[in-house]
Amino acid sequence: LKKTGAEILIDALAQEAVDVLFAFPGGQVIPIFNALYDAKDLKIVLVRHEQAAAHAAEGYARATGKVGVCLATSGPGATNLITGIADAYMDSIPIVAITGQVPTSYIGTDAFQEADLVGISRPVTKHNYLVKDVRDLPRIFKEAFYIAGSGRPGPVLIDLPKDVSVATLENYQYPGSVSIRSYSPTIVGHPKQIEKAAEMIKNAKKPLIFAGGGVISSGASAELFELAVKINAPVTLSLMGLGAFPGEHELFIGMPGMHGSRTANNALQETDCIISVGVRFDDRVTGHVGSFAPKAKIIHLDIDPATISKIVKVAIPVVGDAKNILVALNKILGTREVSEWNEQINKWKGERLFSYKHSEKSIKPQFVIEQAYEMTKNKDAIICTEVGQHQMWTAQYYKFARPRTFISSGGLGTMGFGLPASMGAALAQPGKLVLNIAGDGSIQMNIQELATISINRIPVKIIILNNEYLGMVRQWQDLFWDKRYSSTCLRGGFLCKDCKGPGHCKVKYVPDFVRLAESYSILGLRATKHADVVPVLTQGLESDGPAVMEFAVTPEENVFPMVPAGKPIDQALEEL
C-alpha cells in the first residue's frame, strides 16, 4: 500500500480513533489539508487562533481521557500552539500537536516561517520529534500517541517538514505495537511499599487523604472513594483533582492551599498521616514549605517518581498507577471507626466550607456560581473556567460530583483557556451540558473563538462575571500594594490616579458582551441586578445552541480565604 506522508498522518489519526481535529491551515501544511479534504469519520474544527486549537485539544482530552489532537502550520502557527502545549504539560494532559515545518533542505537557513519547534517545545513537551524521513512517520505517530497517553500523561509534538508530507512510502503499514527501550512507566506499585503504607495508615490517629489530577488520569475515583469510606478519612482535593471525590460527601473538606477552605488547611497542619495520591505539592497548596504539614508523615502514591520528595519529604513512596495501588491498598486495609479526629474536622467545617457576605444590593459573583450549581447539579454538566477570581469561586462554590466535570488551567494558569477548552469538551461529549465560567478579562484573551462556536453550533453556555477589572491582580494590589490599581481597570486604561471605582468612571466600558455575542449570531443576555440572576441563567441554560450570559458583579469583591504568598497555610486572610 503506497501513501504520502500526509496520507499516513490521516490514516494514523484513524488508527488511533481520533474523531476531532482542531486545526488552522498554512503554507507548510497545505499537503496535509489536501489529504484531510478526503478524510472520513474525522471532524475538522477550524479555529480562529492556533492557541485555541491547543486548548480545545486539551478540553477534549480532559473531558474524555483520550488523546486530543491539534494541527498548525510552521513558524507563527506553530509558536502560537506553545502556550497550550505548555498548559497541557503542567497539568499532565495527553495531547499530540502536529506542526508543519519548512522542507528539510531549508532547515537552518532562516527560511520564511521557519522556527526551531523541537528546540522551542523541548521544555514543555513530554517528547518531541522532527521527522526527516517518511519511512519513520508510521513509527513516530504510534509512539507519539502511546507516550502522550501512558505513564504520566503529557503533550507530544511532531514537527513535519513539507517535503516529508509529500514524500511517498511504498508498502505502508501502521504499526500494531510500540517498543521504546528507554521508556517503560511503572504501573504496578511495589507490594512491600504498599504494605508499609497500609501499616502507617493503620497506626495513624489523624489520617487525611490528599488527592489530585493523577486520580482522574488513572480513572481511580471509585477506588479513592472506597479507601476514604473504609478508613473514615477526610478528603481534600487539589484544583486539578476536583471531581475525583463527591463534593457533597460528608468526608469532603474542600480544596486546600491559597484559596482553599480553612478546614482543609487546618487538617493538613494537624494530620499525622497524609495519604497523597496523584498530586505534586504545588506551591499554591503548600504555602511556606518549611511550615507545611509539620506533624505529618507523608505517603505519596504517584506514577512519576520525579515528583516524589521533590517539594516535601516523603516517608513512604509508592510508584505506580494510582488505580492499581489503591486496589491493592483497599484489599489490605480494614475499616476504621469515626474518631475524635472526624469530630474535630466537623467542628472546623461547620455548616459550610466557604462563606461570603450576601447582598441583594448588587450581584455577588459567588451567588451566580451557587445558582448555576443548583440549576445544573443533576444534569451531569461539564464546567470549564478561564483563570482568575471566577476560577477560584467556581472551585469553592460548585460542588463537583464526578471526575472529568471540572476543566480548568491549573499549573500554568492560562487566561484564555476556558472558551476553547469548552469547545473541545462539548465536541468530545456531545449531548452533555457544557458551561464556561469566565471573567471579563480572561474571556477576551480568546474571544475570537465565538466564531468557531457559532459556525459549528457548539452549544456552550458562557457565564461572564464582569467586574470591569483584572480581578485577581487587582485583589493583590488591594491587599498587598496599597490599592495602587496599576493597569488592572478594564474600563479606564493604564493609570487613573483619581479613580473612585468603575461606578464613577466616565469612560464607557467596552465591549458590550451582549451585542458582541449577537454579532456572532449567539444569544446574548445580561443581568445588572440581583433579581436578574436566576431569570438570565434559566433563559441561557434552557436555550438551544450557545449562549453568552453577562453578570455585572460587585466590582471589588475579593476571593477569601487567601493565604499570602510564602506564608503557612493556616495563616489565611479572611473577609473583614
Predicted regions and their residues:
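N-terminal alpha/beta PP-like core and its mobile active-site loop of ThDP/TPP-dependent enzymes
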Residues: 1-336, 371, 375, 459-462, ...
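Active-site diphosphate/adenylate-binding microenvironment
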Residues: 9-10, 14, 32, 36, ...
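Thiamine diphosphate
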Residues: 98, 106, 112-113, 309-311, ...
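Short glycine/proline- and acidic residue-enriched helix-loop micro-motifs
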Residues: 124-127, 179-182, 346-361, 498-500
